[in-house]
UniProtKB/Swiss-Prot annotation:
It catalyses: di-trans,octa-cis-undecaprenyl diphosphate + H2O = di-trans,octa-cis-undecaprenyl phosphate + phosphate + H(+). Belongs to the UppP family. GO terms for molecular function: undecaprenyl-diphosphatase activity. Keywords: Antibiotic resistance, Cell membrane, Cell shape, Cell wall biogenesis/degradation, Hydrolase, Membrane, Peptidoglycan synthesis, Transmembrane, Transmembrane helix. The gene is uppP. The chain crosses the membrane at residues 2-22, 44-64, 85-105, 113-133, 163-183, 188-208, 225-245, 255-275. InterPro entries: UppP. It comes from Streptococcus equi subsp. zooepidemicus (strain MGCS10565). The keyword Acetylation does not apply. Bacitracin is thought to be involved in the inhibition of peptidoglycan synthesis by sequestering undecaprenyl diphosphate, thereby reducing the pool of lipid carrier available. It is a multi-pass membrane protein. Its EC number is 3.6.1.27. This is Undecaprenyl-diphosphatase. One of its GO terms (biological process) is response to antibiotic.
Amino acid sequence: MLFIELLKAIFFGVIEGVTEWLPISSTGHLILVQEFIRLHQDKAFMEMFNIVIQLGAIIAVIVIYFERLNPFQPGKSPQQIRLTWQLWLKVAIACIPSIIIAVPLDDWFDVHFNHMLPIAIALIVYGIAFLWIEKRNQTLEPRVVKLSRMSYKTAFFIGCFQVLSIIPGTSRSGATILGAIILGASRTVAADFTFFLAIPTMFGYSGLKALKFFIDGNHLTLSQLLVLLVASLTAFAVSLYVIKLLTDYVKKHDFTVFGRYRIVLGSLLIVYSVFKSLF
């Protein structure tokens, strides 16, 4: 039984590692996959699992961008050190809206929107938004082509877009990338800032979910700990590849394909949801 559970954990880790960085909603995909492939765990663990598994993906960002994000990296010039600290300040400013709005409302949105139909609608709505933005941008040049040129005000408003991802199916990366592009950032800058913003956001969110799990009187069994570790390690390994793939992709392509994918998947989920309610 444990062997089968660990195989499922690997599968969920792959799903997380791929969908965390593509603008197609990792949490939404995990919830949907669990309609068909279930871990034999209680509800409290699964709610925590769906969020804490993201730590593996976040650690991949730190590994890939460690030199760029480390202000104490040997060999950096004074100007590079200053720009690194400024980047971290922008990331911190972008976290403010989530701290003020998303954290207090998280449980309410979990109760009312953590279902297939709201996920499907969110997939479609943001899919349409991606198609519209990319069509609009065909005649526009981005104003922000380097992270060092991004203002603190722009970083804050990108953080406001991140709050939208509190609705399952939205996609944290999708919301921040979409917001950054709307605010004039290039696709490369939008993707990079999304990766960096994920570090404090997801560490904090995962920490809160884990803390809530234990405060509510739950305990991790050895099998649950193994499932969580295996899934997180898999997400880490897959993320190392997907992050590099996405950074290369956005240099030559737009996000239209992801918009179309979201619309198709959301439409199929609505059909499935209706079919399931009838039968």
